[in-house]
Swiss-Prot record:
HAMAP family: AcetylCoA_CT_alpha (MF_00823)
Name the record gives this protein: Acetyl-coenzyme A carboxylase carboxyl transferase subunit alpha
GO molecular function, one term: ATP binding
Source organism: Geobacillus kaustophilus (strain HTA426)
Superkingdom field: Bacteria
Length: 325
């Protein structure tokens, strides 16, 4: 059973009524087909209205859905012969990041991604998808290996952020993130990054320096969570919904700002409704990205990546008051 979100409550009520009528028809000698048909038509119309007019906060809720497909879900559906690699060769193995070698339509690739859990036990094991420094160093080790053997790199981004604990800071969390940014900028192989859930702060960006950056339609990508932004700006985390509206964290906002390259459509209601169909949408975009990038040599890949990030945040015009000075 799929957990329903707050904004889906009207749909839940209608579905419940339809189910009750169907159950009643089984036990009573009454034909309620016409009534059920009307309710189903009303449900379909309401679904279209709700999912076509999602607010940024609605999308935050979908991105955080406990049953939303994870990196391993997509690896299972998109790749073959996946061999997971463990450890950073410095400290340990961080299970908040998974990565390894696989084949994508026969092409050897390296796949890396944040991995959260879907229940309490797995979330504790995966640290709720918040990596320690050794996770980022493991990712970097796999990236450098991919570069050595000329394998394209595919990164799945899905984290609230890097783990901010004392031990993580002592082991060099900020250095590990900064090192990944530096090294990813200079990789001579294609790098495709896909935001599949939450993309939070430097913890997400440490896997996000790619030639192509795509986002699932209901994913988010931001420097801080809406709750964190609200707590800083207005000293009240309960204003997270207002912050989400202001922060421009949705795929549509980021496409307009030039931060991402393509929005990957989601199945109605969110990727958690049908992981198989969602994987097909990702496959379509990923296949096209790799075809374009594999045609470029290493020097051109580095240049393209550099120019891409250099253009982010550039001012395209100056107000008259500034020009007058």
């Amino acid at each position: 059973m799929v957990a329903e979100l707050e904004f889906e409550k009207p749909l839940v009520e209608l579905r419940r009524k339809i189910q009750e009528l169907k159950e009643f028809m089984k036990t009573a000698d009454v034909d309620l087909s016409a009534e059920i048909e009307k309710l189903e038509a009303r449900l379909a119309k309401l679904e279209n209205e709700i999912y076509a007019n999602l607010t940024p906060w609605d999308r935050v809720q979908i991105a955080r859905h406990p049953q939303r497909p994870t990196t391993l879900d997509y690896i299972e559906r998109l790749f073959t012969n996946f061999l997971e690699c463990h450890g950073d060769r410095c400290f340990g193995d961080d299970e908040a990041i998974v990565g390894g070698i696989a084949k994508y339509d026969g092409l050897p690739v390296t796949v890396i991604g944040h991995q959260r859990g879907k229940d309490t036990k797995e979330n504790l094991r995966r640290n709720f998808g918040m990596p320690h420094p050794e996770g980022y160093r493991k990712a970097l080790r796999l990236m450098k290996q991919a570069e050595k053997f000329s394998r394209p790199i595919i990164c799945f981004i899905d984290t609230k952020g890097a783990y901010p604990g004392k031990a993580a800071e002592e082991r060099g969390q900020s250095e590990a993130i900064a090192r990944n940014l530096f090294e990813m900028a200079g990789l001579t192989v294609p790098v495709v990054c896909i935001v599949i859930g939450e993309g939070g702060s430097g913890g997400a960006l440490a896997l996000g320096v790619g030639n192509h950056i795509h986002m699932l339609e209901n994913s988010t990508y931001s420097v801080i969570s809406p709750e964190g932004a609200a707590a800083i700006l207005w000293k009240d985390a309960s204003l997270a919904q207002r912050a989400a509206e202001t922060m421009k964290i949705t795929a549509h906002d980021l496409k307009a700002l030039g931060v991402i390259d393509e929005i990957i459509p989601e199945v109605k209601g969110g990727a958690h409704r049908n992981a198989d169909e969602q994987a097909k949408e990702i496959d379509r975009v990923l296949r096209r990205s790799l075809k374009q990038l594999l045609a470029l040599d290493g020097e051109e890949l580095v240049r393209q990546r550099y120019e891409k990030f250099k253009q982010m945040g550039q001012v395209s015009f100056l107000p008259e008051t500034i020009r007058a000075r």
